Regions:
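A solvent-exposed, acidic/Ser-Thr-rich amphipathic alpha-helical stretch
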Residues: 26-81
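Generic structural signal for secondary-structure transition and capping sites
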Residues: 17, 21, 38, 66-67, ...
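Short acidic-aromatic low-complexity motifs
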Residues: 1-32
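Alpha-helix C-capping/helix-to-loop hinge sites
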Residues: 12-16, 40, 92
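A beta-strand edge to alpha-helix "cap/lid" segment located at domain peripheries
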Residues: 1-4, 8, 59-135
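Generic secondary-structure transition motif, activating predominantly at the C-termini of alpha-helices
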Residues: 13, 17, 33, 62, ...
């Protein structure tokens, strides 16, 4: 099951090479999610629920950038139902024009071939702890 989970995570991030590709692939990426998927973000701890909520989160996030891409650095099989994805967000803010480059982590829980939960982290220690891993 673990290799299958890594493959699902890989498909989730495939269109992340550009903002345009992410938006165009939204129906395909949402199909990888369980209808009641949950995504918790670190900014304020908000949890977006359901495919519609997750889709809205992605669209709002992408709207805050003129240019955006997500570069997967590695996908770690955590065993069981989880994979930890380390990535780099690269973009230019829509309002400020400022260049952004930031590392983040997303812990995906996958059951029966579908993403059921995404927890996002900006702190390496927090991400590895949540995944039950050591850095």
């Amino acid at each position: 099951m673990s290799q299958e989970n890594v493959e699902i995570a890989t498909r989730w991030y495939e269109p992340a090479a550009s903002k345009r590709q992410l938006l165009a692939a939204m129906p395909r990426t949402m199909a990888l999610c369980h209808p009641r998927v949950e995504w918790t973000v670190p900014e304020d701890g908000t949890t977006y629920r359901g495919r519609e909520g997750v889709s809205q989160r992605l669209k709002e996030w992408l709207e805050s950038f003129d240019d955006y891409r997500y570069e997967v650095q590695r996908i770690i099989d955590c065993g069981g139902n989880e994979v930890l994805v380390e990535g780099t967000e690269v973009g230019r803010g829509a309002a400020s024009g400022a260049e952004v480059r930031s590392t983040n982590y997303e812990l995906l829980t996958i059951r029966d071939g579908m993403i059921v939960r995404i927890r996002e982290f900006y702190d390496t220690g927090d991400a590895f702890e949540a995944a039950g891993l050591r850095e």
